[in-house]
A protein has these predicted regions:
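Single conserved hydrophobic/aromatic residue that forms the stacking wall/gate
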Residues: 1-13
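Alpha-helical interface subdomain recognition
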Residues: 19-161
Length: 161
């Protein structure tokens, strides 16, 4: 009887921890999207005001395409997370999905911040410009809450491999 109660307690603790991990990873994914959106907004303001070759950077097709691509990645990621939130709130077990959301959102966040920094040129690397902080802050997202490699391992296990 003692071992049975002990086992039940361990299972309750494990279930509670897993539920908290699910919520933490979903929260991290949501934060990554918000952070990427902030970096994009900051960059949009910059390319509308910065001039090169006699015109605003926002007039160059390559830059317009680059920013359109980043905005699309952010929106698609946000939509995925928006789908998970009510399911999580209803108590659905979403280990695979929140692992996907955490790793994907933090990778998108890093890509957005990296590519936005690139559009600032040398200014992007200077600490006087907020985009440099966006870039630095984005890097750690792929580490905490479980590294993205761990997220991929969890996803693979959920796929039965």
């Amino acid at each position: 009887l003692h071992l049975s109660l002990r086992r039940q307690r361990q299972m309750c603790i494990r279930d509670s921890m897993m539920q908290n991990l699910q919520q933490e990873r979903l929260f991290l994914a949501l934060g990554a999207v918000a952070h990427a959106s902030g970096a994009l907004k900051h960059t949009l303001d910059y390319v509308k005001s910065r001039k090169a070759f006699g015109q605003e950077l926002s007039r160059f097709q390559h830059i317009r395409f680059e920013l359109a691509e980043l905005a699309t990645k952010i929106q698609v990621t946000q939509s995925f997370i928006d789908d998970l939130i009510p399911r999580h709130m209803q108590g659905e077990e979403l280990t695979r999905e929140v692992s996907m959301a955490k790793y994907w959102a933090s990778d998108v966040e890093f890509e957005v911040c990296d590519r936005c920094l690139q559009l600032f040129g040398g200014y992007g690397y200077m600490s006087e410009y907020p985009i440099s902080r966006y870039f630095l802050d984005a890097r750690v997202q792929r580490i905490y809450g479980g590294t993205n490699e761990i997220m991929k391992e969890l996803i693979a296990r959920q796929l039965g491999i």
